[in-house]
Amino acid sequence: MVDATEVRWRDTGSLGAFCDFEGKRRFPELGINLNVLQPGQPMGLYHRENAQEDFLVLAGTCLLIVEGEERELKTWDFFHSPPQTEHVIVGAGTERAVVLAVGSRGRGRKGLVYPVSEAALKHGAGVEQETTKPADAYGSFAEWKRSLYQEGWLPDR
């Protein structure tokens, strides 16, 4: 058992902050992240992959871009992304958002694609040229830094 306010976080700068609950070794079958997004911050870049992912908004408002269409997500809204579904989540509204993200692992990076999406580009969450390489997709972003939990990232208990 761990307390999210006491474990290692990563500050990704313009892509928000997240806690993955893992130490030096990744969980082999399931990835789970607690993401904190300010308005306008994407959780990552618009993509599709061979694994399913699920997202639950715990606080705030987000913009979901799925298959090129924009939809609002509010507190307690859940989004299931089947394999090969193009998607990204962006913080929206006037306050920070907290999103729990869960995804299956074990299939490697095969099938990961960052396609071009006008909707995602409009929100700073897309690539200008399709790629299958995360290093190319995220090349213009600052390197992620290890961080301690910052007071106010998560809702009060």
Per-region residue spans from a language model:
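A short beta-to-alpha transition loop/helix N-cap that caps and shapes the active-site region
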Residues: 107-113, 123
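A generic structural signal for short beta-strands and their flanking turns/coil linkers
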Residues: 28-33, 51-53, 60, 83-85, ...
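A short, N-terminal "cap"/entry segment at the start of jelly-roll beta-barrel domains
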Residues: 1-29, 118-157
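Ligand-binding loop in jelly-roll beta-barrel domains
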Residues: 63, 75, 83-109
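Conserved short histidine dyad/triad with adjacent acidic residue
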Residues: 14-20, 33-49, 83
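Short, conserved beta-strand element in jelly-roll/cupin
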Residues: 34-39, 47-65, 102-105
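Short acidic-glycine-tyrosine-enriched beta hairpin
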Residues: 54, 68-84
